[in-house]
C-alpha cells in the first residue's frame, strides 16, 4: 500500500496522474494474481537475504519483500537482528530462499554461488532447488518495479 500511495502522490506532484494510476493498477493486478495462486499452494517458510562480506542481512516482515511474502500467504522466518550468522542460516529450515543482489547478471550469479556451497546443502530450499535471485532495486524502494517484484516473488513461492 505504501508503494502504491507513493506512486499516486508522485503522479499528482508531477501531473502524471493517469500514468501513476496505470502503474498502481498493474501492481494491484500482480498482487491479486499472486494471492489467487497462493490459495492453491502450500504456504512457504521463507528467508530473503543478502550476502555481504562477513555477514548475512535478512529482509524481514517490515521491508517490501517481507510484506509481499506475507500478502501472498507465506511466512518470513524472523530473527531478532537484521544480520544472521552462517550457522543461523544453515539451521533456519527455510523451504524457499530469495537472495538479493546488486548489479548485473554476473553479480547475481556471484550472489547465488554464496548459497550453493556444501555448508548450506542441508537447507530444504537449497536441497529442493528453491533458491531465487531478486535484484536489490526490486526490493528496496522499488516503486515502478513493484509489480515485477510481486510477480518474481509469487513465481518463486508457488511455481517452482
Regions found by a protein language model. Name each.
Residues 1-2, 16-26, 53, 57-61, ...:
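Extracytoplasmic/periplasmic, Sec-exported soluble proteins
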Residues 2-5, 12, 21, 38, ...:
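Structured C-terminal subdomain patch of bacterial secreted/periplasmic proteins
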Residues 82-86, 117:
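Structural motif corresponding to alpha-helix initiation and N-cap regions
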Residues 70-80:
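A local structural motif
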Residues 10, 15-17, 58-59, 69, ...:
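A residue-level marker of the well-folded mature domains of exported/periplasmic proteins
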Residues 19-72:
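Basic- and aromatic-lined ligand-binding clefts that recognize polyanionic substrates
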Residues 86-99:
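Proline-aspartate-enriched helix->loop->beta-strand connector
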